[in-house]
A protein has these predicted regions:
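Conserved pre-ATP/AMP-binding loop-to-beta segment of ANL
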Residues: 3-4, 18-21, 118-134, 140-141, ...
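Conserved AMP-binding/adenylate-forming
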Residues: 48-88, 174
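Conserved AMP-binding/adenylation subdomain of ANL enzymes
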Residues: 153-170, 177-237
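Conserved ATP-binding loop and adjacent catalytic segment of the adenylate-forming AMP-binding
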Residues: 198-199, 259-301, 309-313, 323-329
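Gly/Ser/Thr-rich phosphate-binding loop
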Residues: 215-220, 228-283, 380
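Conserved ATP-binding/catalytic segment of the ANL
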Residues: 304-358, 362-363, 375, 386
Length: 445
């Protein structure tokens, strides 16, 4: 069923079966369920108290808790623009993002808020109903993408149309709500189908959340799924897993299917409010395009998307970047390479942009990373690439040994999440090949 707002979802199911659980979480060591009727009432109550803040953007340091979900829904219902930030991000990143989104107030853990030393700004360019997500990069090149509750609800509808859940299902929400895949596929997908959403207890409970909540459906990034499979943590009630936000090895998908669990692989972007295509058959890499979307493949192989109900309003306060993201006739340029088979299913084959995407959902902006490494390796001709999911440093004509290189880049390594650290070093005999404009021909690395 298609909804236009978060309140629409709650009001509909509170009217159809008010006592059915909307959310289940741990509270004081006990499992607590909140019905659709109870959640709706709580949202209305909190929204009333937030209306005094009209015209200000509320930055929510999302921790995935019940209170966090309530705050998001209530702030939007009160007419406040909202920016969702990852509560576990480094303090410096959070300060930059608070400033970038023109936050007028902030919600989150009191100690964290005090530590950040937040200072409210008086003006915001965001509108009521706008929800800002920062693209999942770890550099200051990450942009704030302006979505809306309507575009997010439409995205949830698209997912439910291809992979429907029922009121008897429980969807496990273990991903950050500050990531659009986690928000749509870990929360809205379940609620828009009238299912119950189990709110995970954080990374330290990855090892026992599935056994504790007993979900029937799960959305996961490849890194999380790999951990769950490796440690035999998939619960017996689980019947469907949606995997997205990064490349997923075929062996991992096959390991899940071998347990009798249906697995679907999804493709989407923050700029399209998450999902664009989902695999429905035996081939996880042949993805059916979502009902509201159209795809085409450009001459250079780039995937382009027409998603009028789900596409972003733009990048916050960055009209030039917004204009550059679209063709003259309105197609979104994804920076991904792919093809469409005879059945119209999407196959993603690689990336065109100078960005690496990792299995934990984060991204690395290559020109900036390479500039940092060049400062540690002056005079070296170098580039980064990704092979088998690992970061590889390629040097052209270098006279340094691998040990000398490892020592030189050690300061850069220690500031990176493990997924982004250099895993291998390769050498070419001569200089790296480049285009006429001086860019490395990454496809030749």
């Amino acid at each position: 069923m298609r909804f236009q707002s978060f309140l629409d979802i709650l009001e509909h199911y509170a009217g159809v079966f008010p006592e059915a659980p909307a959310l289940v979480c741990e509270d004081g060591g006990e499992k607590r369920a909140e019905s659709y009727a109870q959640l709706l009432a709580a949202v209305h109550d909190r929204a009333e108290s937030l209306k005094i803040c009209a015209g200000r953007c509320e930055a929510i340091l999302a921790d995935g808790s019940y209170d966090c979900v309530l705050e998001i829904f209530a702030a939007v219902a009160a007419g406040l623009p909202v920016a969702l930030l990852d509560a576990d991000a480094p303090d410096e990143t959070l300060r930059e993002q608070l400033n970038a989104c023109d936050a007028g107030l902030v919600w989150g853990d009191e100690d964290l808020c005090e530590e950040l030393g937040f200072s409210a700004t008086g003006t915001t360019a965001a509108q009521p109903g706008d929800i800002l997500f920062f693209t999942s990069g770890t550099t200051n090149r990450a942009k704030a993408v302006v979505l809306t509750e309507q575009s997010l609800c439409n995205s949830a509808y698209n997912g439910g149309a291809l992979l429907p859940l029922s009121p008897s299902d429980t969807l496990m929400c273990m991903l950050p709500l500050s990531h659009v895949f986690g928000f749509v596929c870990g929360l809205l997908w379940g609620l828009s189908c009238g299912a119950c959403v189990a709110l995970g207890r954080g990374a330290r409970h990855y090892i026992d959340d599935l056994a504790y909540f007993g979900p029937t459906a799960l959305s996961a990034v490849p890194l999380l799924l790999g951990f769950l499979v490796q440690h035999s943590l998939l619960n017996r009630e689980l019947k469907l897993i949606l995997v997205g936000a990064g490349d997923c090895p075929a062996a991992l998908l096959e390991a899940v299917k071998a347990k009798g669990i249906r697995v679907s692989f999804g493709y989407g972007l923050t700029e399209t409010s998450s999902g664009v295509a989902l695999s429905l058959g035996d081939d996880p890499y042949a993805m059916t395009v979502c009902p509201d979307d159209r795809l085409c493949i450009a001459e250079d192989g780039e995937i382009r998307i027409d998603a009028p109900t789900c596409v972003m309003k733009g990048y916050y306060r960055d009209p030039d970047a917004t204009a550059a993201a679209f063709t003259a006739d309105g197609w979104l340029c994804t920076g991904d390479l792919g093809s469409l088979d005879e059945a119209g299913r999407l196959h993603v084959t690689g990336r065109k942009k100078e960005i690496l995407v990792f299995s934990d959902g984060t991204k690395l902006f290559l020109p900036e990373a390479e500039a940092q490494l060049a400062g540690l390796l002056p005079g070296e001709d170098l580039a980064l690439c990704q092979k088998d999911g690992k970061v590889v440093l390629v040097l052209g004509g270098s006279q340094k040994t691998d040990e000398e290189i490892k020592t030189a880049v050690a300061p850069w390594q220690k500031d990176r999440p493990r997924s982004q650290q250099i895993a291998a070093i390769e050498h070419t005999e001569g200089a790296l090949t480049r285009t006429a404009t001086g860019k490395v021909k990454r496809w030749e690395l």
